[in-house]
Amino acid sequence: MHAADLEKPMVEKQDQSPSLRTGEEKRDVSISRLREAFSLRHTTENKPHSPKTPEPRRSPLGQKRGMSSSSTSDAISDRGVLRPQKEAVSSSQGPSDPTDRAEVEKDSGHGSTSVDSEGFSIPDTGSHCSSECVASTPGDRGSQEHVDSQEKAPETDDSFSDVDCHSNQEDTGCKFQVLPQPTNLTSPNTKVF
């Protein structure tokens, strides 16, 4: 469908009743948002590293349909399409939410913390937690070699009974748990997510 084909039925329907007019306005705004998102997506696919948004492309889009570009473009830029890009920029600079900031500050630096598009912190700890959770201070790193030797050649199922990952879990911000004895799930140290 062409933009000119959409305008003619909308003008006729707007004269019928005010309730249809608000519905049609909502429909028109949603169509313009879809077109805007589509044009932005193609622009970002062609130039993925471009930090600027294509401002000049939006103005002709509203003018081609015969609508005032200021009302349509302003409504889109204020509410919908540009918001995810602004959030992505702010999340790359650091967390703006106080809870995210506290979570990153709680990290001791053994694992890198990244923030995804929704703002959740994801610790990059590798395939297992023992090296990040157990060695939280330089003094604990000497005992880390002992833990690694037990991991490589465990003699019995109780080889991890003397290792307590829970004591350093809050200090490092590590999200993983190592339970020494999986049969005892009702201990007070066990956290349920």
Curated annotation (Swiss-Prot):
Q: Where is the composition biased (Polar residues)?
A: 180-193
**Could you tell me where the Basic and acidic residues compositional bias lies?**
1-15, 22-58, 76-86, 98-109, 142-155, 163-173
In this chain, the stretch annotated as Disordered covers 1-193
User: To which protein family does this belong?
Assistant: Belongs to the DNA mismatch repair MutL/HexB family.
What protein name does the entry list? Protein PMS2CL
Instruction: State the encoding gene.
Output: PMS2CL
